[in-house]
C-alpha cells in the first residue's frame, strides 16, 4: 500500500525533536491537491474544536468553496456584522488597547500624532459621559453624538448648569475638544468601516468566519484593516485555525504582515497558486513560518526556476562509455568477431557534478495529484489521494 502524504509528513515529524508544528504551505496550480489538503486541514480543525478563519484572497473572494469544502462548520461572512472581532477596540485604558487602536488606524493613514488625538477624543467622551452619570459601554453610535461642536457644547453646558463642573472646567474641556475634534471627524468616517467588526458575537468552535479580502483588491486599506483585526483577535484568542487562500496575483504584503504577527501557537495554513511570485522578503516570511511545504505544478517558468533553486542540488555521477574496434585483419578472424575479442569496451565514471534536484521543466510538467513535499530538510515526490 503506497504511503500517503500525511503518513510521510508524520514520519518526518517524528524524527525531529521537538516535532515542528503541523502547519502547511501548499503552492502550485493543482486545484485537486488544494482541495485534498484543504479538506484535511478543515476536518482536523473541526475535530479539535477550533474556530476557523478563512482569509480569502482570491478574485471576488469566492475561493473558499472552490479550494476546500467547509464540512461541519457554520460559515459566516465577516462583513455581515454577525461576528465581533474587536469589541474592545474602543477600550484605550491600557497600553495594549492603545497599541491595538493605533495599529488599525495606521492602516487608514493615521500617523502617530493623529492616532493619539483619537485616543484623547475617546477619553474625553468617557470623562464627559461619566460626569453626566452615563455608565453604558462605549459604542460607535454613542460616539457619534460627540461629532458636532454644538452637541459637545450643549453637554458641557448641562454639566456646568447642574454644578458638576465649574465654568473654568467647561472652558478647559471645550479647549480640549477643539484640539482633538479634527482627528475625531476623521475617526468617525473610519468607524463606519469598523462597525461590522465591533457588533455581533464572539466566534464559537463551530463557526467558520470568511474574510473575502480578495473582493477589496482595489482597496488596500480595507484589506490591511481586515487582516489587522484578525491578527489582533487571534493574539487575544490563539486557540484558533487560520487558513489563507491566495490566487497568487497582485500585491500581497498585507498577508505576509499578518502571518508575521500571528502567535506561534496559532495553527495557520496557506494554499496559494504561486508563493514564488511574492517578493523575496515576503517569500522568506512564508518559508520560515511553515515548516512543511508542498509544491505542485507551477505555471510561471520564473517561479519554477525559483522553486528549482529552493529545492537545491544533488551530486550526480555521470558515466561515459567508449568502444574501440581493432580494424587489423589478423584481429578480425571469424572467432574474434564471434567472441567480440576484436573490440574493447571502456566505462568511465566522471567526477560528481551538482545538478538541480528538480529541474524547472520537470516542476512545470508535474501531473495532476503529484507534489513535492519539503519537510524536515528532506524532499520527496508523492501522490495525493482524497
What residues fall within each predicted segment?
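Alpha-helix N-cap/helix-start and coil->helix boundary motif
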Residues: 60-61, 275, 301
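P-loop NTPase motor domains
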Residues: 1-266, 281-282, 361-366, 372-385
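Conserved H-loop
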Residues: 57, 270-278
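P-loop NTPase motor core of the ASCE superfamily
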Residues: 109-116, 279-386
Amino acid at each position: 500500500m503506497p504511503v500517503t502524504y500525511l503518513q510521510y509528513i508524520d514520519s518526518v515529524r517524528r524524527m525531529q525533536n521537538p516535532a515542528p508544528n503541523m502547519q502547511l504551505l501548499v503552492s502550485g496550480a493543482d486545484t485537486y491537491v488544494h482541495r485534498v489538503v484543504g479538506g484535511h486541514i478543515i476536518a482536523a480543525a473541526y475535530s479539535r474544536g477550533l474556530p476557523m478563519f478563512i482569509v480569502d484572497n482570491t478574485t471576488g473572494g469566492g475561493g473558499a468553496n472552490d479550494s476546500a469544502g467547509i464540512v461541519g462548520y457554520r460559515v459566516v461572512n465577516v462583513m455581515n456584522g454577525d461576528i465581533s472581532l474587536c469589541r474592545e477596540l474602543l477600550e484605550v485604558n491600557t497600553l495594549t488597547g492603545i497599541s491595538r487602536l493605533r495599529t488599525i488606524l495606521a492602516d487608514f493613514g493615521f500617523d502617530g500624532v493623529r492616532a493619539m488625538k483619537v485616543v484623547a477624543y475617546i477619553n474625553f467622551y468617557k470623562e464627559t459621559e461619566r460626569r453626566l452619570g452615563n455608565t453604558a459601554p462605549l459604542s460607535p453610535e454613542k460616539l457619534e453624538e460627540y461629532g458636532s461642536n454644538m452637541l459637545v457644547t450643549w453637554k458641557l453646558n448641562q454639566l456646568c448648569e447642574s454644578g458638576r463642573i465649574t465654568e473654568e472646567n467647561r472652558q478647559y474641556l471645550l479647549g480640549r475638544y477643539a484640539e482633538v475634534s479634527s482627528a475625531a471627524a476623521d475617526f468617525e468616517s473610519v468607524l463606519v468601516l469598523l462597525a461590522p467588526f465591533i457588533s455581533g458575537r464572539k466566534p464559537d468552535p463551530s463557526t467558520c468566519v470568511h474574510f473575502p479580502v480578495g473582493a477589496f483588491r482595489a482597496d488596500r486599506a480595507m484589506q490591511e484593516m481586515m487582516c489587522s483585526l484578525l491578527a489582533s483577535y487571534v493574539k487575544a484568542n490563539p486557540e484558533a485555525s487560520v487558513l489563507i487562500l491566495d490566487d497568487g496575483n497582485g500585491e500581497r504584503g498585507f498577508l505576509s504582515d499578518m502571518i508575521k504577527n500571528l502567535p506561534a501557537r496559532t495553527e495557520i495554513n496557506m494554499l496559494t497558486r504561486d508563493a514564488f511570485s511574492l517578493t523575496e522578503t515576503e517569500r522568506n516570511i512564508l518559508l520560515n513560518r511553515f515548516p512543511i511545504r508542498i509544491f505542485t505544478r507551477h505555471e510561471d517558468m520564473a517561479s519554477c526556476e525559483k522553486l528549482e533553486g529552493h529545492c537545491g542540488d544533488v551530486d550526480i555521477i555521470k558515466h561515459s562509455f567508449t568502444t574501440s574496434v581493432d580494424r587489423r585483419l589478423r584481429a578480425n578472424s571469424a572467432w574474434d568477431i564471434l567472441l567480440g575479442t576484436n573490440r574493447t569496451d571502456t566505462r568511465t565514471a566522471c567526477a560528481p557534478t551538482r545538478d538541480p534536484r528538480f529541474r524547472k521543466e520537470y516542476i512545470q510538467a508535474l501531473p495532476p495529484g503529484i507534489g513535492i513535499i519539503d519537510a524536515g530538510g528532506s524532499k520527496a515526490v508523492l501522490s495525493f489521494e482524497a
